[in-house]
A protein has these predicted regions:
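A well-structured
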Residues: 2-148
């Protein structure tokens, strides 16, 4: 690996690590929402989750990050099993999936997940599926869009 390639690889890894830290914070907010969020806190948590999901998505679809990954992928053969080549292939595969999703969909999925979780808890406690049905249908609609 040339010095320039090593430098680019380190930049890509640094970018991916920071993105992973942001994703773990997002997951922590999700855990907290499912276990500790007080009633009435869902709207604010949905805003937090939506903002963070959008920021994470922006990092994944960042043009410079994509160009660096493409360059690194072009430098390594498909059968290269070095740690660096495997990392690049996995990051590129993850990025390729994410660039297909519009940011608005990513944000709406995040928001709907939070609101749906809270609606489900209330519906379960009140034995009233209708309280949850609208958000469940919206979630399914968004997941279908994501799958397309």
């Amino acid at each position: 690996m040339s010095k320039n390639t090593a430098r680019v690889f380190e930049e890509v890894c640094r970018h991916a690590r920071r993105t992973a830290v942001m994703a773990s914070i997002h997951e922590f907010l999700g855990w907290d929402e499912r276990t500790m969020l007080p009633p009435g806190g869902a709207e604010h948590r949905a805003e937090q989750s939506t903002l963070l999901a959008g920021m994470i998505h922006q990092r994944w679809v960042d043009d410079k990050f994509g160009e660096q990954l493409d360059g690194l992928a072009a430098d390594s053969a498909d059968n290269d099993v070095s740690d660096a080549a495997v990392i690049v292939r996995r990051l590129k595969r993850q990025r390729d999936k994410r660039v297909k999703l519009p940011q608005s969909l990513v944000e709406e999925l995040s928001r709907t997940a939070v609101m749906g979780q809270q609606a489900w808890q209330e519906a379960r406690n009140g034995d009233d599926f209708a309280m949850f049905q609208r958000l469940l249908e919206r979630t399914l609609e968004l997941k279908r869009q994501q799958a397309d």
